[in-house]
Regions:
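Short acidic active-site motifs
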Residues: 20-21, 50, 97-98
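Alpha-helical segments flanking ligand/cofactor-binding loops in enzyme cores
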Residues: 23, 53, 100-101, 155
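Short Pro/Gly-enriched coil loops immediately N-terminal to beta-strands
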Residues: 22-36, 52-56, 131-139
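A late-sequence structural motif
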Residues: 127-166
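Hydrophobic hinge/microswitch elements
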Residues: 2-6, 11, 78-127
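Short helix-loop capping/hinge motifs at secondary-structure junctions, enriched
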Residues: 37-51, 147-152
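Secondary-structure junction motif
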Residues: 50-52, 59-81, 151, 158
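Short beta-strand-centered segments that line the small-molecule binding cleft or hinge
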Residues: 1-34, 42-44, 104, 127-129
Length: 166
């Protein structure tokens, strides 16, 4: 966006860059995604809701450094006083689909965007647990340069995205 290669971008983080306009268009929350096993079904079905501390010893797969999801997860961990040293991190992956397949195949759990796992949740291939803190919501933004005049078709796309998600 800044170098003019693209007119706009859809991003998961507001970098607060003064030369850009950030328009929130979609809100999402982070969830704990787990395989469907007896252990996680028991957690899901117990009377008291599962909390993140119930998952501390479980094998966890992280997103790569620089990922917006990873940054939001780091903020969540910081707010709850948990460090990565407290977790059983078994892998760091830069491909969301690989993480999802790893979860389905029982390799571990992960903290992911609820929208990114809706397909697997609908088909009952995973279980999802909410994070207990209210401050784990994430916004997505349309971003474009303040220094560029948007073409009519780009403005139309921005309006379409806003109408679709809002």
């Amino acid at each position: 966006v800044l170098d003019g290669t693209v007119d706009l971008a859809l991003v998961g983080q507001n970098t607060r860059d003064e030369s850009c306009v950030f328009i929130p268009f979609c809100h999402n929350e982070l969830v704990i995604a787990t395989p469907v096993t007896d252990h996680y079904l028991a957690l899901k079905n117990r009377e008291t809701p599962a909390v993140f501390h119930d998952f501390l010893k479980d094998p966890i797969i992280f997103r790569e450094k620089g990922s917006g999801t990873k940054k939001e997860m780091d903020l969540f961990l910081e707010r709850t006083g948990i460090t990565t040293d407290n977790l059983n991190v078994i892998a760091r992956m830069n491909d969301l689909e690989s993480i999802k397949k790893s979860i389905v195949n029982g390799l571990g759990i992960s903290i992911l965007s609820s929208r990114s796992v809706n397909d697997l949740l609908r088909t009952k291939q995973i279980l999802v647990f909410p994070l207990e803190e209210a401050a784990h919501k994430r916004s997505f933004y349309i971003v474009y340069s303040k220094n560029r005049i948007l073409n009519p078709h780009v403005k139309q796309f921005v309006q379409f995205v806003r109408d679709y998600y809002m």
